[in-house]
């Protein structure tokens, strides 16, 4: 058995089409959605990802602006830039590209973003809404993973799902999202201090690998027929043609055991970007409704 592919490119294409129509409708009402991205330093991977986000904006019809700051930018200077964007009436959504230099407290910067402009869905208020089940802005990658599975008609309700990794951008919010009333799965949160990691993973119907460790998930960790979602994007050198070699958190031979598996390229990545664009549109629509009711 060779696993079927969880095709994030195909699923995201349909989402982008819907978002383009929503953007046109907003423009017809005099609203121009706009995403502001702040990039600190010159990390090649971060720069490449930011540029891909802005290409998505252009394709959908969302305006975008990129604020580039040097690597030696102080935490105070960065937060000051964020506050300027918070006060800008033409900016619908804000993202500060992660990771940030070690000298900057990532949490303080995220907390400085206006929750009503938090396009990444990582502000404590929006994460709190996720916990309580109140409708808010959901972190992009967790939302994208759920959409990807739903698009392939993979039932999650009542299933046991192992989430390997407990980062604040994927692992933790994904566990909350999957165990919430909207999905109703049983979630096993696995991390580096967990005992019997392989055994815990092997009982799961769905395994989501988001540890950021190359090929940490071995074929022996997967029960036959399980669904595997590989979130990992690990840089493993450069090819002879000069292209960056990317590897996931899941060993390639796992495809011979799983029923479905997401590819490293074209799996979760396009879904994350689609959910970011969806968040920007949602923030624009919310702001439009607020102003409409206030008038």
Swiss-Prot record:
InterPro entries: Aminoacid_DH-like_N_sf, NAD(P)-bd_dom_sf, THF_DH/CycHdrlase, THF_DH/CycHdrlase_cat_dom, THF_DH/CycHdrlase_CS, THF_DH/CycHdrlase_NAD-bd_dom. It comes from the Bacteria. NADP(+) binds at residues 165-167, 192, 233. Keywords: Amino-acid biosynthesis, Histidine biosynthesis, Hydrolase, Methionine biosynthesis, Multifunctional enzyme, NADP, One-carbon metabolism, Oxidoreductase, Purine biosynthesis. It catalyses: (6R)-5,10-methylene-5,6,7,8-tetrahydrofolate + NADP(+) = (6R)-5,10-methenyltetrahydrofolate + NADPH; (6R)-5,10-methenyltetrahydrofolate + H2O = (6R)-10-formyltetrahydrofolate + H(+). Pathway: One-carbon metabolism; tetrahydrofolate interconversion. GO terms for cellular component: cytosol. GO terms for biological process: L-histidine biosynthetic process; methionine biosynthetic process; purine nucleotide biosynthetic process; tetrahydrofolate interconversion. Its EC number is 1.5.1.5, 3.5.4.9. GO terms for molecular function: methenyltetrahydrofolate cyclohydrolase activity; methylenetetrahydrofolate dehydrogenase (NADP+) activity. Belongs to the tetrahydrofolate dehydrogenase/cyclohydrolase family. Homodimer. Catalyzes the oxidation of 5,10-methylenetetrahydrofolate to 5,10-methenyltetrahydrofolate and then the hydrolysis of 5,10-methenyltetrahydrofolate to 10-formyltetrahydrofolate. This is Bifunctional protein FolD. The lineage of its organism: Bacteria, Bacillati, Actinomycetota, Actinomycetes, Micrococcales. The gene is folD.
């Amino acid at each position: 058995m060779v696993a079927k592919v969880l095709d994030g490119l195909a699923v995201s294409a349909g989402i982008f089409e819907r978002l383009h129509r929503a953007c046109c409708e907003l423009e017809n009402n005099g609203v121009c959605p706009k995403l502001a991205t702040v990039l600190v330093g010159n990390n090649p991977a971060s720069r490449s990802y930011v540029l891909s986000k802005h290409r998505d904006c252009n394709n959908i019809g969302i305006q975008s602006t990129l604020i580039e700051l040097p690597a030696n930018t102080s935490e105070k200077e960065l937060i000051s830039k964020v506050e300027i964007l918070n006060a800008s009436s033409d900016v619908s959504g804000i993202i500060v590209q992660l990771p940030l230099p070690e000298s900057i407290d990532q949490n303080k910067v995220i907390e400085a973003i206006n929750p009503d402009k938090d396009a990444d869905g990582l502000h404590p208020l929006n994460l709190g809404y996720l916990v309580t089940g109140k409708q808010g802005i959901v972190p992009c990658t967790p939302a994208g993973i759920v959409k990807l599975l739903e698009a392939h008609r993979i039932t999650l309700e009542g299933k046991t799902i192992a989430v390997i990794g407990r980062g604040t951008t994927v692992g933790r919010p994904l566990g909350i999202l999957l165990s919430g009333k909207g999905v109703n799965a049983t979630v096993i949160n696995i991390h580096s201090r967990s005992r019997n990691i392989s055994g815990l993973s092997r009982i799961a119907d769905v395994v989501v690998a988001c540890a950021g460790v190359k090929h940490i998930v071995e074929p022996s960790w997967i029960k036959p027929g399980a669904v595997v979602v590989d979130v990992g994007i690990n840089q493993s050198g450069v090819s002879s043609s000069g292209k960056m070699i990317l590897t996931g958190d899941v060993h390639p031979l796992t495809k011979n055991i799983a029923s479905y598996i997401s590819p490293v390229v074209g799996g979760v990545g396009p879904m994350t970007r689609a959910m970011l664009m969806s968040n920007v549109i949602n923030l624009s629509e919310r702001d439009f409704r607020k102003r409409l009711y206030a008038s």
